[in-house]
Amino acid sequence: MTMTLHTKASGMALLHQIQGNELEPLNRPQLKIPLERPLGEVYLDSSKPAVYNYPEGAAYEFNAAAAANAQVYGQTGLPYGPGSEAAAFGSNGLGGFPPLNSVSPSPLMLLHPPPQLSPFLQPHGQQVPYYLENEPSGYTVREAGPPAFYRPNSDNRRQGGRERLASTNDKGSMAMESAKETRYCAVCNDYASGYHYGVWSCEGCKAFFKRSIQGHNDYMCPATNQCTIDKNRRKSCQACRLRKCYEVGMMKGGIRKDRRGGRMLKHKRQRDDGEGRGEVGSAGDMRAANLWPSPLMIKRSKKNSLALSLTADQMVSALLDAEPPILYSEYDPTRPFSEASMMGLLTNLADRELVHMINWAKRVPGFVDLTLHDQVHLLECAWLEILMIGLVWRSMEHPGKLLFAPNLLLDRNQGKCVEGMVEIFDMLLATSSRFRMMNLQGEEFVCLKSIILLNSGVYTFLSSTLKSLEEKDHIHRVLDKITDTLIHLMAKAGLTLQQQHQRLAQLLLILSHIRHMSNKGMEHLYSMKCKNVVPLYDLLLEMLDAHRLHAPTSRGGASVEETDQSHLATAGSTSSHSLQKYYITGEAEGFPATV
């Protein structure tokens, strides 16, 4: 009995000693495992061994299979407040630790299974918002990572930041390298699928241009032929899209020689055609049709016009063949110049040129598709501009002089004999110098002259009927065709896209200067008529009166409509009938057939 009591006392003392030794580590600060990775990476994979250090300094190596059988403490979450050690380790035994002489084959883990995470560490169950990250290659959208965790180790935090920065830089450099290899469509700026018809273009623009060059190109812009063509609005206006295709350099023969053939490309072409057919009835075309009134979307009875089916080379050939012959003046070198003699020479030459101008206009592609009234109207508005651009073109090879005819070459001093003629001479010489500096070609000259004819009176039609609107639409389409021919000539000459745009703008700006010269010349000629300096010939006189009729300004306080009505009652009808007479007599005299 005594032995038994002694044994119990010794056992209790030994037990208290063991408790003191084992509970000593509990007085140290609580160990927290830093989480350097998202929670999804904290749980161990069965193939990766791990090593954990415990307060006693012992190291245990185990894998996830052993960890699955390990005893887990603190099922309600890790305590983060002072005085919570007892709650963390429970009340069974000595803080939940097994005896020292019976080490468990499974190591201890201070980890939580996924269902038991604390609320503030619970990962989001939905998509994390996106944020912008500033990289050297620009602002890019990236998916936000998991929420930030408490990291007591500042070195580990800096190391993690350096790793993320290095990863971001690598991604940014890869994005920049891939961006350098990306090519965009020259028409709509979408991603290019290849080199089609001479330029880098997408599949949609390639299919659209393919359909257009096969004859389906009778498009009409519902606005001002200046629609924006980009990825989102390329289907809204087919006319402006086709124009931009030509502007960027697309051409029928612009196919790469290293292009492969075979079944793969045949299947690809079929897919392109299917996509192209889907574009015809797109919502963008329906919106464009509904936005504009029906008079602008009239049925095109002239859509089968021969002029609209000509290629660029055929258009140039037709315009060159239509050029009038060179006429000689009645100049007598033995007679000195006077105001009356010089004006007589010039007006006689202009009157004879007008007869040939009528024949030339009838051979301009698309001109004879208009009504006779509209043909006369365009000629009445543009005749002096056409004469002046021809004079400037002939004078290119004679700096400082104007070649009115092969036997009539005048300089500025000779023009002083006519009052008010020097100012007009100076403007003509300046325009000729500009043509010479630009090295204007004959093909470009005939295109510019045709543009003057068709564009001069298109906005001054006296009627606004449906027929008149149809005529205007036809004129605009022929003008677009001639403009495309100009661009084709520049591309054929080897000019870059930027040089083509610059040259086209410079040429069209010269036309406004020629219009200004024509107005000055018309005023001077009318003043000569009022002074009775020289008798004017019938056709020239009627052309002058017709131009005064179509002038937009009113005289003597009368309105424009009243002025037009008074002229129509007097000279207007006579002028039109007289000019129509020259049409009939010109055909009877055997002029060449029209286009």
From Swiss-Prot:
Which family, according to the similarity comment?
Answer: Belongs to the nuclear hormone receptor family. NR3 subfamily.
The UniProt gene name for this protein comes to: ESR1
Q: How does it assemble?
A: Binds DNA as a homodimer. Can form a heterodimer with ESR2. Interacts with FOXC2, MAP1S, SLC30A9, UBE1C and NCOA3 coactivator. Interacts with PELP1, the interaction is enhanced by 17-beta-estradiol, the interaction increases ESR1 transcriptional activity. Interacts with EP300; the interaction is estrogen-dependent and enhanced by CITED1. Interacts with CITED1; the interaction is estrogen-dependent. Interacts with NCOA5 and NCOA6 coactivators. Interacts with NCOA7; the interaction is a ligand-inducible. Interacts with PHB2, and UBE1C. Interacts with AKAP13. Interacts with CUEDC2.
| Phenotypic consequence of Y43P | Impairs AF-1 transactivation
* Segments forming domain NR LBD: 311-547
Extract the ranges annotated as region (Interaction with DDX5): 35-174
Protein name stated in the entry: Estrogen receptor
Which intervals of the chain are annotated as region Required for interaction with NCOA1?
A: 35-47
Q: What InterPro entries does the database record attribute to this sequence?
A: Est_rcpt/est-rel_rcp (IPR024178), Estr_rcpt (IPR001292), Estr_rcpt_N (IPR046944), NHR-like_dom_sf (IPR035500), Nucl_hrmn_rcpt_lig-bd (IPR000536), Nuclear_hormone_rcpt_NR3 (IPR050200), Nuclear_hrmn_rcpt (IPR001723), Oestrogen-typ_rcpt_final_C_dom (IPR024736)
Q: Name one GO biological process term.
A: epithelial cell development
Lineage of origin: Eukaryota, Metazoa, Chordata, Craniata, Vertebrata
Annotated positions of the Phosphoserine modification: S104, S106, S118, S167
Other comment? Selective estrogen receptor modulators (SERMs), such as tamoxifen, raloxifene, toremifene, lasofoxifene, clomifene, femarelle and ormeloxifene, have tissue selective agonistic and antagonistic effects on the estrogen receptor (ER). They interfere with the ER association with coactivators or corepressors, mainly involving the AF-2 domain.
Q: Whereabouts does the entry annotate DNA binding, in residue ranges?
A: 185-250
Q: Which Gene3D superfamilies does the UniProt entry name for this protein?
A: Erythroid Transcription Factor GATA-1, subunit A (3.30.50.10), Retinoid X Receptor (1.10.565.10)
Post-translation changes: Phosphorylated by cyclin A/CDK2 and CK1. Phosphorylation probably enhances transcriptional activity. Self-association induces phosphorylation. Dephosphorylation at Ser-118 by PPP5C inhibits its transactivation activity. Phosphorylated by LMTK3 in vitro. Glycosylated; contains N-acetylglucosamine, probably O-linked.
